[in-house]
Amino acid sequence: AAFALPALASSFEKDVISFRAIQAVLEKRGLSKLEDDPVLSALAHTKTIISNPVIEEALLNGANLKAGNGIPCAESCVWIPCTVTALIGCGCSNKVCYNSLQTKY
């Protein structure tokens, strides 16, 4: 995953979301694939979709992670708010989407 971090850093010009976070939203909404909901698909494609190990290393272990923010939702909110993971209760804090549930996406 370390080789992907420079690419991730440059992609922060466009916010990121993990495929696993998208899957969690799809499951909650009872959908099987992103194309089943055109609105959700459009929201997801406003961000760069990346693999979960990359976002875990960059966001979960990043310097901006502070105690009390909650569980990172595998979506960034540098330029665009938490759009996709907001559907599962995530909000923006320090450029990362968090929720207070005890589940990691």
From Swiss-Prot:
Propeptide residue range(s): 10-69, 100-105
Family: Belongs to the cyclotide family. Bracelet subfamily.
Keyword Acetylation assigned: no
Record GO biological process: defense response
Name of the protein in its database record: Cyclotide vibi-E
Keywords annotated in UniProt: Disulfide bond, Knottin, Plant defense, Signal
Crosslink position(s): Cyclopeptide (Gly-Asn): G70-N99
Disulfide bonds listed in the record: C73-C90, C77-C92, C82-C97
Annotated organism of origin: Viola biflora
Alphabetized Pfam families for the sequence: Cyclotide
Listed InterPro entries: Cyclotide (IPR005535), Cyclotide_bracelet_CS (IPR012323), Cyclotide_sf (IPR036146)
Signal peptide: 1-9
Domain notes: The presence of a 'disulfide through disulfide knot' structurally defines this protein as a knottin.
Function text: Probably participates in a plant defense mechanism. Has cytotoxic activity, active against a human lymphoma cell line with an IC(50) of 3.2 uM.
Record PTM: This is a cyclic peptide.
